[in-house]
């Protein structure tokens, strides 16, 4: 090789060397995000989208299952005023304190569309003027909806709070049905109880009113309300029928238990993961719903619960079993041609809440907890 050719060859190497070296460095330099990191990041993004859509869906489902067009406009202050300080309600709240939001071994309802009510607590309102004389009595009228009438009554209890007596005495608690003033005798006594009370002690008393409630449901036109009196030996009326200062939550209310439909028990099973799990298959992930974050003060309990959600890959084609499947499709459009990871088993939650009429309802909201995920 001539010297001139060698010089030319070396010149080409020198000229091309930095380019080639630079190109090699470009390929060999570690990337800021490896393929594994990129895939993991994309998976996290999909999960976050699914969680957001699941929360929005839960809002809509609760209102739909409770047959509400929108959430009741009941603030936290109103809740404090309306919430009875009574034994049956306190027992329910104590249950939530003990159980927390544990969803194990829950009971599933056959009705997957609407809430099955167990207990209704109705606050008393002022009777119509036709049964009042000089604006009295101020209490008590209980209203019933068509939905309520369609259910079978198991038990109906009227709860009345008695103010403390000045001395140990016998109190005669009387419950009378009201009639229009024009009908002459506007009081029909239906129940009378004799109660011994101690001095300086207030108490809640319950009276069975199932019979009169049954009459009201069969003949709504006869429901003009009731009058409640609890006279001691001195003629003082100790019954709290309208809230005096410091007596919020002590007004009379009716606790009605109605029959439930058939139900069955389903056990929880399936593949469970946490947010840091590397699992790529269809799996159930934790998701906590916080009603206070929604601004839903009208829900008394639970304040939060574990709803869970499904995410992951599927390999086989199946038919969709639940409407929640479309949430995954929206979050991952590229996967819509194949099977989706979706809830295959769901269970209800027990909820204590105010409806739009400011009645306290305790019931089951079906299909609110994801128990198991699968491909469909």
UniProtKB/Swiss-Prot annotation:
Location in the cell: Secreted
GO biological process terms held by the UniProt record: negative regulation of skeletal muscle tissue growth; transforming growth factor beta receptor signaling pathway
Residue stretch(es) of the prosequence: 23-267
PROSITE patterns (UniProt xref): TGF_BETA_1, TGF_BETA_2
S-S bridge residues: 273-283, 282-341, 310-373, 314-375
Range of residues in the leader sequence: 1-22
Assembly and binders: Homodimer; disulfide-linked.
Protein name per UniProt: Growth/differentiation factor 8
Species annotation: Epinephelus coioides (Orange-spotted grouper)
Taxonomic path: Eukaryota, Metazoa, Chordata, Craniata, Vertebrata
